[in-house]
Amino acid sequence: MDAASGILPDYAELFCRSNFSFLHGASSAEELVERAAKQGYRGIAITDECSLAGAPRMHVAAKAVGLPLVVGAYFGVTPDDAAPGHDPGPGAFGLVLLAQNREGYGNLSELISWRRMNAPKGTYRLTPRMLAAPPRALAHLRGVPDCFAILVPTYPARADVLDAQLAWFDALFGERARLGLVQLQRALDGAHREQVRAAGERRGMHIVALGDVTMHIRSCKPLQDTMTAIRLGMPIAECGHALAPNGEQHLRTRQRIAQLFPADALAQTCRMLDACHFSLDDLRYEYPHEIVPAGHTPTSYLAQETWAGARRRYPDGVPDTVRQRIEFELALIADLKYEPYFLTVYDIVKYARSKDILCQGRGSAANSVVCYCLGVTEVNPQQSTLLFERFLSRERGEPPDIDVDFEHQRREEVIQYLYEKYGHDRAALAAAVSTYRPRGALRETGKALGVDPMLVERVAKEHRWFDGSRDLLARFASVGLDPEVPLIRTWAEIAARLLNFPRHLSQHSGGFVVSRGKLTRLVPVENAAMEGRRVIQWDKDDLEALGLMKVDVLALGMLSALHRAFDMITAWRGPPLPDGRPFRLEHIPQDDEATYDMICRADTVGVFQIESRAQMSMLPRLRPRGYYDLVVQVSIVRPGPIQGGAVHPYLERRRIAAGEAHGEITYPSEALERVLERTLGIPIFQEQVMQIAIVAAGFTPGEADALRRAMAAWKRKGDLGKYHERIVAGMLERGYSREFAEQIFEQIKGFGEYGFPESHAASFAKLAYASSWLKRHEPAIFLAALLNSQPMGFYPPAQLVQDAKRHGVTVLPIDATKSGWEASLEAQPGAAPPDGRPAVRLGLSLVRGLGEEAARRIGAARAAGPFASVDELARRACLERRDLEALAAANAFATLAGNRRDALWQAVAAAPIDEAVRPALGAPTEADDVFADYRTIGLTLNRHPVALLRPALDARRLSSAAALRDRRNGRLARACGLVTARQMPGTAKGVLFVTLEDETGCVNVIVRPELLERQRRETLDSQLLAVSGVWQCESDVRHLVAQYLEDLTPLIAGLRTESREFH
């Protein structure tokens, strides 16, 4: 029947590109599925261009609404000079491939991988030869078996061209071949339809209706035009015929579709849909087999290694509680057949340890005693109230997630080990989806719309963030743009739509996928930007949704710094014990009073995890005095506890517990007391929220884990509501008040912002304490280790050096006659190892423009004897002129040539200069040296730049950081310093936190939203910022609440400083 009879024919859209066809598709998978379901489609296909990147999201969305999904891909096919019998004739055409079953999906995935790895980025077209005669290793892909193939003719179709193409197409694809008909309300649609109909009839090939969909609704057309312009690198006004002539490439109503297409072409869509039996749920991950030695099964080998590790962890005997826990975990792991996963991670960690690469597991894996015994994690589950179900349970239906951090400077060794062990065909990194950020969206959209480039740059520079088009229009108005002007309104609307849109695939920070067979038959693989690496087309969320294994091989800078510090301690002071083993983490004394005193003062610049502005503000209030306090400290300065209203109640209860405040710490029940006792009755961790659900609302452990997942997703999907009634009813049934039940639910919602797992915090707290101990007891070694581990951490080298100098560390300048590539330790006059405190000699790595190889040659030449002049150094180390100039500008020739200017002259001359002809060069001023230092090495050992300005700042009545420390609360105050950080946490409600540094320390500044809007340029662009406001000092937490800002950057014009922006 047709529309005329009153009954609409069924229809399935089989040609649909999402926004993972980058800069082609203008709608997300979720939007496309929702629209197709609303229109009553029988099903839908996802056919992104040479890609399956969007397939998992489409799968999840379609599954949620019960809409059948076909997985496929689209390819452009261009003619080639193939051998006779392979040439489809002149002209290009489109090819849609749809997987009919698991085998067809594997073939499609392998075809995509082949093209992606052997074509320039963005040019993934096929040729007839590739389809008909692929390389011998891929001969099984000839004709892409078990996939429907739809030829999409070039518009408008020509009979001779189409006949030639169909003859070739039919011979290659046979009964799987179909001829696609696209109708987009273009001028020649009637003629095109007739040509397609006639060609299909002559060839006896089924014709199938196609929508060539790139957007879910017509109103996305301006966004699609903008993306076309971005893709072509020209304004929309110059794109001409490259733009779609109308908005017909959307999911049209079935009434409209019935009017446009023949009934047989519509019926064919449903017949093909019904013939495609593949779902991404059919994918089955097979673990590698190399990890199990001969004579063992995965079960027996994991048990053997776990019990051996338990004996090492508990040399005085494995406690009964641990023994029972090991037996329980091993039984569950075996039942779920996850032993190969644990053994894969164990193998990676074993390799790293064999190469003396520092590593540590974190995240939910710290809940597992098996991981602890295997040496994957360092947190003893007995010492924390951890929850194994946060890591693994029967109800989860997917493998656990084990994250392992490695030294960031040596992680590549671990990655290459995986490639060598499993081969590039079986190992690849997970993808990360790079999306449009605020500035990029504004810039790209503005250029596409033809906005004046200078205006585009000014607006983008001043808008690091925005929240939707209304917010953006208001911000535009604040910088003098009229929101009523159509161009400005369009700019705001499209930029807001483009925000967070997928832009391209990059590589995940360390998620690795390894498989037993060819990975390309599980998921498409392509070359990563870094040579020697490959990346799959799915990200970590896709892998999780499909239950596929990922091993996180992550990089952590602090592990590099700790390892370097430990080695320096051993070299400087000798081994810590008579056995001669080097200093390591276990040799750091626990519960060191001096270390905790330093932490409580928030003296934590450079320390892991507790060095940020927010953490420093919390430290004097929470006052950690032990390891578990640090676990709480790491976790509490997070959106989850903040939004859940946990911070102030917890701090108040700490004061009550310490006898500093009146009150009583109570618990709603004995059962909840066991859950919340360690955090004084206030839920801080994700595990506690799960345990509350189990103990107080009757959830099973698996259901509690599902709640945790919903918590993590509710801001994005809003699906926490279904748990509200269950939690409240369960708590009422167990005797809790409705008020308390509602309070708990609100706290759970708060954790949806970002609740920190205790297992994660427990791992990080160990590193926080270790780095704090080093800063307190070995500050010079700690500084050298941090400098040699850059880039890492919160602070650039300039701030690390200034902080170390304030702590009495002697920092010696770069000297080509003494410095190595890295920072090193030297004895100070009158002090010697092992008891003396060393000085730090800065390394040549800081010199901008100097390569490591040149620095190594200097070191090798120096080892043969001292240098008498710059010329001799240049000759013996074979330095080029650019190397000499870089060293001279950095004042590295001071001991050979005097001041910087003389050194530069000698470097240019590259020979000793006769005193009679040497120009009379005046010595540079202190200010000259400071500016040159920042320009050439990024820091100075001379006076702080602000110290040089102190007379001028005093005249403006601007106080130093030191002078403000003792000012009374609520007094007016003025300060000035270099901007070293700007932060706006998601929980700050528009408040910006700015850190200023002067010669005496740092001032923390609070800039409220209204002031930020009034003085956006001063706030965001100043290098040297003066602030007038109200001084607040409470519980050793000090900050300046800004009322007026002044940009004094002209006073330091030309000074190159670094600041941490919005991290």
UniProtKB/Swiss-Prot annotation:
Listed GO biological process terms: DNA repair; DNA replication
UniProt xrefs under InterPro entries: DNA_pol3_alpha_NTPase_dom, DNA_pol3_finger, DnaE2, DnaE2/DnaE/PolC, DNAPol_HHH, PHP_dom, Pol/His_phosphatase_N, Pol/histidinol_Pase-like
Organism: Burkholderia mallei (strain ATCC 23344)
Protein name: Error-prone DNA polymerase
Keywords on record: Cytoplasm, DNA damage, DNA repair, DNA replication, DNA-directed DNA polymerase, Nucleotidyltransferase, Transferase
A Pfam cross-reference name: HHH_6
Signal peptide extent: none
Superkingdom of the source species: Bacteria
Gene Ontology MF annotations: 3'-5' exonuclease activity; DNA-directed DNA polymerase activity
Keyword DNA damage on entry: yes
Enzyme Commission code: 2.7.7.7
A GO term from the CC aspect: cytoplasm
Subcellular location, record wording: Cytoplasm
Major location category of this protein: cytoplasm
Entries under Gene3D superfamilies matching the protein: 1.10.150.870, Metal-dependent hydrolases (3.20.20.140)
HAMAP family from the UniProt entry: DNApol_error_prone
Role played: DNA polymerase involved in damage-induced mutagenesis and translesion synthesis (TLS). It is not the major replicative DNA polymerase.
Reaction(s) this enzyme catalyzes, per UniProt: DNA(n) + a 2'-deoxyribonucleoside 5'-triphosphate = DNA(n+1) + diphosphate
